[in-house]
A protein has these predicted regions:
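Acidic, proline/glycine-rich low-complexity intrinsically disordered segments
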Residues: 1-211, 222-227, 231-233
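Residues that form generic nucleotide/phosphate-binding pockets
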Residues: 8, 12, 48, 247, ...
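Charged, solvent-exposed alpha-helical segments that act as regulatory interaction surfaces
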Residues: 14-22, 253, 284, 288
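Acidic, Ser/Thr-rich low-complexity linear motifs
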Residues: 23, 28-29, 93-95, 253-267
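TPR/TPR-like (Sel1-like) alpha-helical repeat modules
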Residues: 216-220, 232-255
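Short amphipathic alpha-helical segments that mediate assembly, nucleic-acid/protein binding
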Residues: 227, 240-244, 272
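Terminal, low-structured helical/coil segments at or just beyond the last alpha-helical repeat
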Residues: 256-295
């Protein structure tokens, strides 16, 4: 019993989004980038990863790049920078002058594992980079290795659960996602899309809609996609259209490339077809369109 309590306290204090990280993030807030320590740059990454704010990403990337110029063998910073580059790919953001963000993410992740093979954070970065490179099996294996190294890491648990949800492996997906939120209620909201997809696939559309609304964001579309498909299946045409408007505000051409996008994300084909059909019913046309935003 004492060991379980100690583990719970340590998890609440030390893991990303925990109290220590939150305190350090507060302390570094407002500091000029040139005055941030290497550790503070890593802390800023974890603060950014609570919301995956597109606006904050360039500063976080710059801070981590500065860190690695000074400390090229800092494994965790290398893993964090890999994930920052990965975010441009997985969220469909314009990477601007960044060249080959996916290739850079994969190279950085592999280097981080070489530097620290027993680091769960490095395995996490490698798993995400491999997944979005199309290597589903090895991506899942790397995430599972990361979780084995640190079974208390609720972030790896949630990302692995989300990967299983995308592949329609519902039992493993829901077990991991529910466990991750039980361990860390402060987890980023976008992980709710995995639970939303599970409910959607089983015809529990009201529950799917409730989970999707917990994943709303002005910077990425996945919560809105889940909201649109659940609302469409509930016959809530205005809610569905409003969610489509949010998708299009982020990606005006999404209707024309939704099938390709879902395939690139390794969505299980049957689930992908169900999502596309519901998006069409929600009002997402194949031709580019714009609708008003709701948030």
């Amino acid at each position: 019993m004492r060991d379980a309590v100690a583990e719970s306290v340590a998890r609440a204090l030390a893991q990303p989004y925990g109290m220590i990280f939150a305190r350090k993030a507060q302390e570094s807030e407002g500091k000029p980038p040139e005055l941030l320590t290497s550790y503070e740059c890593v802390v800023r990454f974890h603060a950014y990863a609570r919301t995956y704010s597109r606006e904050r990403r360039p500063a976080v990337r710059g801070c981590l790049e500065k860190t690695l110029r000074a400390e090229p063998d800092y494994a965790e910073a290398t893993a964090c920078l890999s994930r920052v580059y990965m975010d441009a790919v997985r969220f469909g953001w314009d990477s601007g002058a960044e060249r080959d963000p996916l290739g850079r993410a994969l190279a950085l992740a592999r280097r981080s594992v070489a530097l620290a093979p027993h680091s769960s954070q490095c395995r996490h970065a490698l798993g995400m980079a491999l997944w979005f490179s199309g290597d589903v099996e090895q991506g899942v294996a790397a995430l599972e290795a990361g979780l084995a190294l640190n079974p208390s890491d609720s972030e790896i648990m949630a990302d692995l659960g989300l990967r299983f949800a995308v592949r329609a492996d519902w039992a493993r997906a829901t077990d991991l996602l529910e466990a991750s939120f039980a361990r860390n209620p402060a987890q980023p909201g976008h992980y709710h899309i995995g639970l939303s997809m599970a409910h959607f696939a089983h015809g529990r559309y009201e529950a799917a809609l409730a989970e999707a609304r917990r994943a709303r964001s002005r910077d990425h579309a996945f919560g809105w996609i889940c909201e649109a498909v659940a609302a469409a299946r509930l016959g809530l045409s205005q809610d569905a259209a409003a969610a489509v408007g949010e998708i299009l505000a982020l990606h005006p051409d999404y209707g024309a490339r939704v099938e390709d996008d879902l395939a690139a994300r390794n969505v299980e084909p049957g689930l992908g077809r169900a999502i596309v059909a519901a998006l069409r019913d929600a009002g997402l046309a194949a031709a580019p369109q714009r609708l008003p935003r709701v948030v």
